Amino acid sequence: MDTPELRSRPDDARPHVASTATWAPPLPEAPGFAHQVVETTGLRSHVATIGEGEPVVLLHGFPQHWWQWHQVAPRIAAAGYRVICPDLRGAGWTEADERGIERETRLHDLLDILDALGLERAHVVSHDMGAITALQLTYTHPERVGRAVQLSIPPGFMSFSPRLLPAFRHMPKLIWHRPGNALRGVWSDPYCAKVTPDATIDAHLAPMQRREIDDAVRPLYRGMVIPEAMRLARGEYQRMHLTIPTLVAFGRHDTRFNEPLVRRLCENPDRYADRMEFVFVENAGKLLPDDAPDAVAELALDFFDRDS
């Protein structure tokens, strides 16, 4: 396989080890992780890393941040990988000069982070909103991706159906999100198969205390999620071909995307992708990294190693 060339690095792109002792709110506990800040034009991205070896990038969902992977990343790292967990723009402890977010803003941010860290290619594991950025990366910059594992979101070539409407019932509240409104409902039925401790929810939502992060909810949905959903509805990705081996995983208790619906929406995957596999995880809902961290790590490791 040809080695991809790194893009021209922004003049100010530089990673440096961060002392997080004075960060507010404090970072949640996660033994073994190191923390860096990658500075690029107008953006200071917090990146948590663990392990050494072939790189694996984990892209969090909404409203989570890097800590969503605190039970998954160490398991992958223990198998001999360097695991990189960035706080994407509008989340966690990343800081942006501009509050605007467009459809591919996070994609360009991610490419800058990969370049600043000297990562030519990496495996990518993504969940929920993070899967939008991962999907864009695999289609537009396949040379930067080894293999992809996508959690709780169907592939880009899925067909649209009225049966999808329940999956979007939360959207109006987020499109019109008012700063200060609670998001604790994300960790309730039908999204979780298990009861999530209050302390865990508090850790996920801690960065919402920062006005910048709370204010980012509407731009994320209006500027990125809705435009990308419109592209999916128009079948844009059905006119493209995915070359990256991809595993798509759902929780059995994810009532938005049960197996019969997913199979129906994603018929004839060989027509749209070189290699696309589906798996359904027992005792898990939409929030797979919370409900089944061991299973997520094992699925990813098996997929990375298979036929390699």
Predicted regions located by residue number:
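A short, glycine- and basic residue-enriched loop/turn
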Residues: 65-66, 132, 285
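Flexible "cap/lid" subdomain of the alpha/beta-hydrolase fold that forms the substrate-access gate
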Residues: 3-34, 43-47, 91-121, 125, ...
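Conserved HGGG/HGGXW glycine-rich cap/lid loop of the alpha/beta-hydrolase fold
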Residues: 46-93
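Catalytic histidine-centered segment of alpha/beta-hydrolase-like enzymes
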Residues: 284-293, 297
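A generic "binding-loop/recognition-motif" signal
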Residues: 43, 53, 284
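Alpha-helical macromolecular-interaction surfaces
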Residues: 71, 78, 105-108, 112, ...
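Conserved residues in the N-terminal Rossmann fold of short-chain dehydrogenase/reductase
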Residues: 37, 85, 280
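Short strand-coil-strand connectors
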Residues: 39-41
